[in-house]
């Protein structure tokens, strides 16, 4: 049979999950207008980030997410061997990201969150409802990676200083900001006819109403966190991003956060996680487990 007559092979499960994870990162970056975050309108509160860099970073992580899904197929169960494989792949993915961005941290938190969720989905693709996937991800996150020394990241310092739940704890508790806030708001706004982009903005704002965003705390302390949470709630109370009053409140929140140099990067990572989970069941369909 000639090459022209060959039937294309269907994408493997690992490839579909990697596609979905990268799509979630790109969709989060493109969503506009987000308060003080990189989007199609501006670079937000960042001087070292722009939309093209976010896209390049997301695309560079596709092999990492695929290998994580492959690891789930190899080990087939939550446990230390799979957890340590994920840790190694995550560190390698972070190194790839930093090479791509010339040292700028674009998606470190997203590698953690989406890496866990990709792996959790790959462990049981027949049971990919939000609660099930997040609970499997939590079980993985609770296992200590023995190859990692004590962390001194900005996020870990903020967690120690303020006693809040950081990215690690968010995962270990099954992503409550996604399950309890983002996904329900996404569904409510869709049902209200807000349009997909506004529904996603509302989901981001729902996360921001309760999240102790360590990126905001690092940059602007408790004042910044309170500004973020209260401002996001005002947008939703005004009718959400689809309403005129909500858009005015959203613009005001953007200006307030920019004045504080506070960018809700933790909320952005969790929105990407929300979009990944939201797209799981529609995207998987019949899959091949072959690599």
UniProtKB/Swiss-Prot annotation:
Q: What does this protein do?
A: Involved in the formation of 2-(5''-phosphoribosyl)-3'-dephosphocoenzyme-A, the prosthetic group of the acyl-carrier protein of the malonate decarboxylase.
Q: What is its EC number?
A: 2.4.2.52
A Pfam cross-reference name = CitG
Q: What is this protein called?
A: Probable 2-(5''-triphosphoribosyl)-3'-dephosphocoenzyme-A synthase
Keyword annotations of the record: ATP-binding, Nucleotide-binding, Transferase
Q: Which organism does this sequence originate in?
A: Pseudomonas syringae pv. tomato (strain ATCC BAA-871 / DC3000)
Q: Lineage from the top down?
A: Bacteria, Pseudomonadati, Pseudomonadota, Gammaproteobacteria, Pseudomonadales
Q: Which Gene3D superfamilies match?
A: Triphosphoribosyl-dephospho-CoA protein
- InterPro entries, alphabetized: CitG (IPR002736), TriPribosyl-deP-CoA_syn (IPR017555)
């Amino acid at each position: 049979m000639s090459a022209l007559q060959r039937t294309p092979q269907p994408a493997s499960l690992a490839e579909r999950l990697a596609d979905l994870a990268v799509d979630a990162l790109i969709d989060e970056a493109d969503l506009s207008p987000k308060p003080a975050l990189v989007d199609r309108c501006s670079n937000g509160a960042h001087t070292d980030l722009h939309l093209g860099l976010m896209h390049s970073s997301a695309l560079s992580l596709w092999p990492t997410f695929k290998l994580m899904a492959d690891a789930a197929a190899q080990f087939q169960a939550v446990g230390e061997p799979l957890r340590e494989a994920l840790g190694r792949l995550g560190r390698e993915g972070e190194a790839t990201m930093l090479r791509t961005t010339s040292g700028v941290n674009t998606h470190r938190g997203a590698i953690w969150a989406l890496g866990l969720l990709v792996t959790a989905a790959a462990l049981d693709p027949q049971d990919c409802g939000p609660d099930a996937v997040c609970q499997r991800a939590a079980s993985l996150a609770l296992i200590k990676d023995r190859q990692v020394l004590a962390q001194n990241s900005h996020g870990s310092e903020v967690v120690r200083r303020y006693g809040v739940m950081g990215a690690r704890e968010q995962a270990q508790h099954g992503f409550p900001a996604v399950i309890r806030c983002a996904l329900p708001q996404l569904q409510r706004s869709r049902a209200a006819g807000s349009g997909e982009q506004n529904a996603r903005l509302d989901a981001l704002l729902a996360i921001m109403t309760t999240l102790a965003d360590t990126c905001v705390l690092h940059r602007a302390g408790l004042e910044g966190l309170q500004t973020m949470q209260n401002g996001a709630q005002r947008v939703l109370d005004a009718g959400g991003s689809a309403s005129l009053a909500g858009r005015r409140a959203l613009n005001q929140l953007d200006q307030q956060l920019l004045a504080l140099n506070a960018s809700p990067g933790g909320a952005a990572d969790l929105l990407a996680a929300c979009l990944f989970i939201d797209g799981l069941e529609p995207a998987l369909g019949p899959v091949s487990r072959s690599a």
